Amino acid sequence: MKKFVSLKKNSDFRNVYRFGVSAANRYLVLYKFPNKGLGRRFGFSISKKVGKAVCRNRLRRILKELCRFHLDRFSDDCDFVFIVRQTSSDQDFHQMEKHMWHVWGKLNKQEKN
């Protein structure tokens, strides 16, 4: 099984935002940017507007677990950044999974065009 790697540097996040492809729904925004052989990396951005620290950390843990669980579905050598919107604050694991795959489908559709 492949290792889960997180984006850490601000410059990595900025590159994904500036040059990546994005798709969104009411709950999530997903950015995807091909990197040069650095492997599959994930970043999570959750604003303080979403809720208190407990809520933000719960959403981050849910998304991190979803990415880890479905690691093989994500493209190799790409950076992915999930931005959680304010409406996500009351969502549970299965709802977030549904929203994640909805955004993933929109992103793949957009890349094909």
Swiss-Prot record:
Catalytic activity: Endonucleolytic cleavage of RNA, removing 5'-extranucleotides from tRNA precursor
E.C. numbers: 3.1.26.5
InterPro entries, sorted: Ribosomal_Su5_D2-typ_SF, Ribsml_uS5_D2-typ_fold_subgr, RNase_P, RNase_P_CS
GO cellular component labels: ribonuclease P complex
Annotated PROSITE patterns: RIBONUCLEASE_P (PS00648)
Entry similarity comment: Belongs to the RnpA family.
Protein name according to UniProt: Ribonuclease P protein component
